[in-house]
A protein has these predicted regions:
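Cytoplasmic helix-loop-helix junction between adjacent transmembrane helices
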Residues: 111-148
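Glycine-rich segments within core transmembrane alpha-helices of 12-TM secondary carriers
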Residues: 141-162, 185-186, 378-388
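Extracytoplasmic
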Residues: 17-51, 157-161, 260-265, 388
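Extracytoplasmic gate region of multi-pass secondary transporters
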Residues: 36-37, 235-298, 354, 358, ...
C-alpha cells in the first residue's frame, strides 16, 4: 500500500473513531454550559434575580474555570487524557445537578463557581488530545469537526430547554429539571470515556500495523520539526509572545461571545413578545440560528485549511460579527425580522472563528507546551466569559434595554479582531517563514 493510500485510510479511521465521540462529549459540555441562559427565562423570576445578579452568576463560572485551567492541563499530561477527561465529565455532571437547587444569589454564585472548577481544562485537553492524532495540515478541519458541537449543542439545546421550562414534575420547576436532565448524559459519557479513548497512538488497537506506524512516524516528525525551530517547555510556552497575544485576542472575543450567548434567550424573548411568538417557538427559531452558525463553522474551517491561513479567517469573522451585533442594536425597535437576521450573522461570525483560531497554537507548539499554551489562552480568554455577561446584565439594569450592551459587545469583538490580525505572527503561511528565519539565526 502506498503512502498516500495509508494516509487516507488512517486519517479516515482516526476521524471516524474520535470525532463523533468527542463531538458528543463536547455537545453535552456545551449544553451544560449554556442551559443557564435558558433557565434564566423562568429562574430569575422564581428566585427574584436581577439581570446583574444573573450575569454575575453566569459569568463567575469562568473564574473557577480560569483558576484550574492551566493546572488541569498539566494534570492531563501527568495522568493521561483518558482518566483526566473522564474525571472532568463525571464531577461536572454532579455539580450541574446541584445548581438546580440553589435558592439565594450566594448559593447561585458558589454553585456556578465550583461548576467552573470542575469543568476547567476540558476544552484545551480535548484540542491538545485531538491534535496529537492528526497531521498539522488537517488540524483546522479536525478541530472544526468536533467544535461544531458548540453551535450544534445550542441548536439542540434551544428547543429542548424551552420545552423543559414548561414542565413541572415532582414539585420541581422546569428550570430545575433542565439542569438535572441535561447533566445525566455527562455522567454516562464520562464513564464511557475512560474505556473508549486511548492515551497515546502506541496504545491504539483499531489501526493496522502499517497505519499505526505511519501515524507515529508523521506525528513524531512534525513534533521534531517544531522543536528544531525552538523547543518550548510547558512554562516557556506560557511566556511566548504569540501565546500571550492570542490570549488577549481570545479574551476580547469571549467577552462578546458569552455576552451575547448567555443573554440571547432573554434578548430573543423580548423581541418575540412584540410579535406574540411563544417561548417554545422562540426556541426553534434560536435553534435555526445556531444551525446557520454550525454550517459557517464547517465552511470557514475547511476554507482555512484549503488556503493554509488562520489569522485573517479569525479576524474577518470577528469583524463581521461585531458589525452585525451593532446593527442589530439599532434596528431592534424598527424591524424584528431584520434584528433576528443580524443576530444570526453575529452568531455565525463568533462561531466561524473557532476552528482557524485553535489551529494556530498546535502549528508552532507541541506536546506539553501545546497543552499548556492552549490552556492559558483558554483560561485567560474565558475570563471574558465572566466580564461579558456581568457587564451586559449591569448595562441592561442601568439603561433598561440591551442596545448599549450590544454596542459594548461589538466594540470588544472589533478589538479582538484587530489584535489577531495585526499582532499575531504565527499563522498559516506566515509561520513557515518565521521558522526558517529562526533556524538560520540558530545555525
Amino acid at each position: 500500500m502506498d503512502q498516500l493510500a495509508i494516509e487516507r485510510s488512517t486519517t479516515k479511521k482516526v476521524t471516524l473513531r474520535l470525532i463523533p465521540f468527542l463531538f458528543l462529549c463536547f455537545t453535552i459540555s456545551i449544553l451544560d454550559r449554556v442551559n443557564i441562559g435558558f433557565a434564566a427565562l423562568k429562574m430569575n423570576h422564581d428566585l427574584g434575580f436581577s439581570n446583574a445578579i444573573f450575569g454575575l452568576g453566569a459569568g463567575i463560572f469562568f473564574l473557577g474555570y480560569f483558576l484550574l485551567e492551566v493546572p488541569g492541563s498539566a494534570m492531563m499530561v501527568k495522568v493521561g487524557p483518558r482518566k483526566w477527561i473522564s474525571r472532568i465529565m463525571v464531577t461536572w455532571a454532579i455539580l450541574a445537578v446541584l445548581v438546580a437547587f440553589v435558592k439565594t444569589p450566594m448559593e447561585f454564585y458558589i454553585a456556578r463557581f465550583f461548576l467552573g472548577v470542575a469543568e476547567a481544562s476540558f476544552y484545551p485537553c480535548m484540542v491538545a488530545y485531538l491534535s496529537g492524532f492528526y497531521q498539522t495540515k488537517h488540524h483546522a478541519k479536525a478541530i472544526a469537526g468536533f467544535m461544531v458541537a458548540i453551535p450544534g449543542a445550542n441548536a439542540l439545546g434551544a428547543p429542548l430547554s424551552t420545552f423543559l421550562l414548561s414542565v413541572n414534575w415532582l414539585s420541581l420547576a422546569g428550570w430545575q429539571w433542565l439542569f438535572i436532565l441535561e447533566a445525566i448524559p455527562s455522567f454516562i459519557l464520562g464513564i464511557v470515556c475512560f474505556f473508549y479513548l486511548d492515551d497515546q497512538i502506541k496504545d491504539i488497537k483499531w489501526l493496522n500495523k502499517d497505519e499505526k506506524k505511519w501515524l507515529i512516524d508523521v506525528t513524531t516528525k512534525e513534533e521534531l520539526e517544531k522543536q528544531q525551530v525552538k523547543h518550548y517547555t510547558f512554562l516557556q510556552a506560557l511566556k511566548d509572545r504569540d501565546v500571550l497575544i492570542l490570549s488577549a485576542g481570545y479574551f476580547c472575543w469571549m467577552v462578546g461571545y458569552y455576552g451575547i450567548n448567555m443573554f440571547l434567550p432573554t434578548i430573543s424573548k423580548g423581541l418575540s413578545e412584540k410579535t406574540s411568538i411563544s417561548t417554545q417557538s422562540m426556541g426553534w427559531i434560536l435553534g435555526l440560528m445556531y444551525i446557520c452558525a454550525m454550517v459557517t463553522m464547517i465552511l470557514v474551517g475547511n476554507h482555512s485549511d484549503k488556503k493554509n491561513e488562520r489569522r485573517l479567517h479569525v479576524a474577518v469573522c470577528l469583524a463581521i460579527s461585531a458589525i452585525a451585533m451593532i446593527i442589530s442594536s439599532y434596528i431592534a425597535n424598527t424591524s424584528i425580522i431584520l434584528s433576528f437576521v443580524f443576530l444570526t450573522i453575529a452568531l455565525c461570525g463568533t462561531f466561524g472563528a473557532y476552528a482557524p483560531f485553535w489551529a494556530i497554537p498546535p502549528s508552532f507548539l507541541t506536546g506539553a507546551a501545546a497543552g499548556g499554551a492552549i490552556a492559558l489562552i483558554n483560561s485567560i480568554g474565558n475570563l471574558g466569559g465572566f466580564f461579558g455577561p456581568y457587564i451586559v446584565g449591569y448595562i441592561k439594569d442601568t439603561t433598561g434595554s440591551f442596545n448599549m450592551s450590544m454596542i459594548f459587545l461589538g466594540v470588544s469583538l472589533i478589538i479582538g479582531s484587530c489584535i489577531v490580525v495585526f499582532l499575531v505572527k504565527q499563522s498559516g503561511k506566515v509561520q513557515s517563514n518565521n521558522f526558517e528565519t529562526k533556524l538560520k539565526k540558530s545555525s
